[in-house]
């Protein structure tokens, strides 16, 4: 499973924000500023392409009336304020994985940008800020790719790190001869971060209609108006796709997809994806599309010897969740531990409504925080939890988990499996 995760194409759904100073700097012209922002994202996408990551601009916001935070020359303070605004405002109205602020302010010292290390997919920390420090947009793009690199688990390069160029993307200082290349150290650090954190949000491919930037033929992502995209003509190896137009070649029905073979749709009924487990189903081609639609068993079907119920193709049970949090010997705690979820305190609750934690009702205690007993000699506490203020949802009982006979968790409540949940 780890290898499958590492090999999977990743997608960073980005929202780029420009502050009021940027709006003034570019002559109060939204068109000029938007064009600069699009150009920056195109370069960032080019840089991350080598890491098997596609950066898709799903939101662009220009603060043309006034700033929504107090942008100041202290980069630390500005990053903190921007990240809080992202969590409390932007995330609530726009689904995305990462937000970057492009500012016209001059940060103190030599700082050109700042971001949280390994923050991707975390509501509070998937953010960065970058100073528009140069007229040449590709130099600003490299600085933003550097900050996103931090979000994706990469630290600054040491002297021993190499990428085959004079300077690599994660170099600690800005170079007058920058490159679009990540060093061997960056690649190792990014891989180690993916293995450790396994961030899930970047696995989800954005819809072509989610992308707000103008389509770019040659960026390996099929956008509105395109039928295929195999990169630039010089590097395209796809015989089904015309790289110059991003249209299918004459006679081709498709260029990619699990139900596409040699530019033609596979026949109806051809298996395109085997069932992963008892809650999954083998997926079949329709003969009319290149897509392999994911099907799974109905929610509520018993699984794992009646210890759980199928939920969206998985079988979530508490023991597996304890093992994921505390290691292979972990077990679910006694029922008494789950009574802490009646308190409605910072960790013991069932759900959040408008950022307020709601205590569990007695019948719902198994749908709040998960309590585990890690079977190690050093552990005396029978009611262990995983709680981090950075990611409060981690360590909660997963949706669809069996909470009683014939019942499963849904939005912090223990509901009948036969009702839609």
Swiss-Prot record:
Its main location: secreted. PROSITE patterns: ADAM_MEPRO, DISINTEGRIN_1, DISINTEGRIN_2, ZINC_PROTEASE. Gene3D superfamilies: Collagenase (Catalytic Domain) (3.40.390.10), Disintegrin domain (4.10.70.10). The active site is at residue 147. Residues 214-299 form the Disintegrin domain. The keyword Disulfide bond applies. It comes from the Eukaryota. Residues 10-206 form the Peptidase M12B domain. GO terms for molecular function: metal ion binding; metalloendopeptidase activity; toxin activity. It is found in: Secreted. Keywords: Apoptosis, Calcium, Cell adhesion impairing toxin, Disulfide bond, Fibrinogenolytic toxin, Glycoprotein, Hemorrhagic toxin, Hemostasis impairing toxin, Hydrolase, Metal-binding, Metalloprotease, Protease, Secreted, Toxin, Zinc. Disulfide bonds join 121-201, 161-185, 163-168, 217-246, 228-241, 230-236, 240-263, 254-260, 259-285, 272-292, 279-310, 303-315, 322-372, 337-383, 350-360, 367-409, 403-414. Ca(2+) 1 binds at residues 216, 219, 221, 223, 226, 229. Its EC number is 3.4.24.-. GO terms for biological process: apoptotic process; proteolysis. Belongs to the venom metalloproteinase (M12B) family. P-III subfamily. P-IIIc sub-subfamily. Snake venom zinc metalloprotease that induces apoptosis in vascular endothelial cells (VEC), without degrading the extracellular matrix (it cannot cleave collagen) or inhibiting adhesion of VEC. Has also fibrinogenolytic and hemorrhagic activities. This is Zinc metalloproteinase-disintegrin-like lachestatin-1.
